[in-house]
Amino acid sequence: MDSLKNRTLLKVIVLGDSGVGKTSLMNQYVYKKFNKQYKATIGADFVTKELHIDEKSVTLQIWDTAGQERFQSLGAAFYRGADCCVLVYDVNNLKSFETLNNWHTEFLKQANPMEPETFPFVLIGNKTDVDGGNSRVVSNKRAIEWCGSKGNIPYHETSAKEDTNIDEAFLSVAHIALSNERKQSNDIYPRGQYHDSVTDIIDPDQSRGCAC
């Protein structure tokens, strides 16, 4: 087993409106479980996934944040130190797509990355299974165009309920986060090991997550 000090910690923040399926995506990816009963996330929580990428041992720490506006003031404490941000919307909910700009802007404001113009984002359009796709209101083309307006960020469509494209989406996130972590490795305060002030207390063999 890899020693703790040789593992790279990648911090990923998942953002989007309440009810788009952020927690369900994470729980499906980490635990292969889906809970039909919706329960809003309060504040923030996280799950972890152990990976090997390019012969490197990685702990992907995925932060699940509340979609309600009253919790957005908590952002700075959770966003800072992130290696990648995943924006999630519901392909059947136009409002959840239209608020992506707000989430994108708010993250950059709160996280305050060193190079905001090149900070990595990934977009996920979730709930593709609903009504066999007949309830969809945001087209694949429109989503890709939005990604193009943000510097051609990667886009994935998923169904947390059916476990469709979940592993592929998060593997893409992990590769992007690792690439960003390596890019930042020459900073004054090297990141990526288990000495980050926010995550010192984390046991990589234990993970927490919401039920929904």
From Swiss-Prot:
One of its GO terms (molecular function) is GTP binding. A motif (Effector region) lies at residues 38-46. Keywords: Cell membrane, GTP-binding, Lipoprotein, Membrane, Methylation, Nucleotide-binding, Prenylation, Protein transport, Transport. It comes from Arabidopsis thaliana. This is Ras-related protein RABG2. GTP binds at residues 16-23, 64-68, 126-129, 159-160. CDD domains: Rab7. GO terms for cellular component: plasma membrane; vacuole. Pfam families: Ras. It comes from the Eukaryota. PANTHER family: RAB FAMILY, RAS-RELATED PROTEIN RABG2. Its main location: membrane. The modification Cysteine methyl ester is found at C212. NCBIfam families: small_GTP. The keyword GTP-binding applies.
